[in-house]
Amino acid sequence: MQVSYNWLKEYIDPGVDAAELGRLYTAAGLELDEVVSRGRGLEGVVVARVLTCDPVAGSDHLHLCTVDAGRGAPLHIVCGAPNVAAGQLVACATVGATLPGGFTISEKKTMGLLSQGMLCSQKELGLADDHSGIWVLDGYFADGTAPVGMDIASALGLIDDVLVIELTPNRSDCLGMLNCAREAA
């Protein structure tokens, strides 16, 4: 069973951090495997809007994108993803950001064009296995007002601690979030 600490806090105020809550669960007869931190390590990856997207001369797949990343002047980013288009909201790693795989973003020339960041897929951010193209965020913001320039983890509520609990046969009552909240209360 995976218990989201943030979701749990919608039901109760645990009064302790996720690690201590895990120890309390263990004392109550549940077996805590681990506490996994999610959404951290994405500093410098922001919500951005692709303003323009033009094919790069001499390439069959590269595009030069002008991107509003909330940093004042628009960024110019060379992107090879097949699904990039003008008007999209995307995840943009700005110069200096270090992605979960340890890759640090820097200004780089590609085919003679300066790229000032990287438009990222979910796999590059360590969030999912999808590497088919960049992560398009259109539709994630219900009111239509996207927080351009905001860290992606904060904007999408990705920062959480997940308690991974191995349920024993005598604790099937904790197969649901409400009973996990009751156990923590």
Roles of regions detected by a PLM:
Residues 1-185:
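Phosphate-backbone binding interfaces of nucleic-acid-interacting proteins
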